[in-house]
Amino acid sequence: MIDPLQASVRIATSGLDAQSTRLRIVAENLANANATAKAAGAEPYRRKTVTFDAAVDSTIGARLVNVKEFGVDSSPYRVEYDPGHPAANENGYVKLPNVNMLVEMADMRETNRSYEANLQVVKQVRSMAAMLIDLLRGT
Amino acid sequence: MLESLALSTLNTIGDSLRTRQVQTSALTPASAATQPASATATAFDSVMGQLAKEAVTTLKAGEAASIAGLQGRASAQQVVEAMMSAERSLQLAISVRDKVVQAYQELTRMAI
């Protein structure tokens, strides 16, 4: 039986890890927001998504969050008229990645908030553990 | 786990106090008194040794995690978690040690 405070830290850390991975995906989407194909009519970058899953950790007997899988967003690509582009099709249209900057920014903010919340749990655990140990210090 | 260790430490101190009380109230001869006194000394030694071992184990885990982090094998979050756990164990070990030493000093100052 593990100390519940220690288990809380472990769980919060899994949350921190998960949100870090999520931020990585957001960064990838943002960086590739204008990554078009090289050849005419080929597919550009497709927006990636990340899904989380609750997995039971038998050593602490609690559910940790971990990354279930990386998926792809199947929404249609943005299309822009640019006949001079190497990836333009016969009608002069270029397919751009289906990355929406606003959506990515909102996702990033949410990631940040969730990370903060998990970090707050860690801080709380530290303060509670310190309070407990301080009981021994007092004369 | 360490909390239970601390509790057992305090219990041991209580036991040793009780042994001393029995010794002083019974006014046993010096030859007979050496036996329980040495038993308490061993208990004290083992408690302190166990405490140190516990603290060293968690500290080692923390160090291993930070080295893994430097080598890129562990995430920063995992390193922080391990270091926090090590810090907590060390703090607890130090507090318990202080308490035990204090109790021991209390015993040595006792007027017989």
Describe the residue ranges of each PLM region.
Chain A
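Amphipathic alpha-helical polymerization modules
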Residues: 1-139
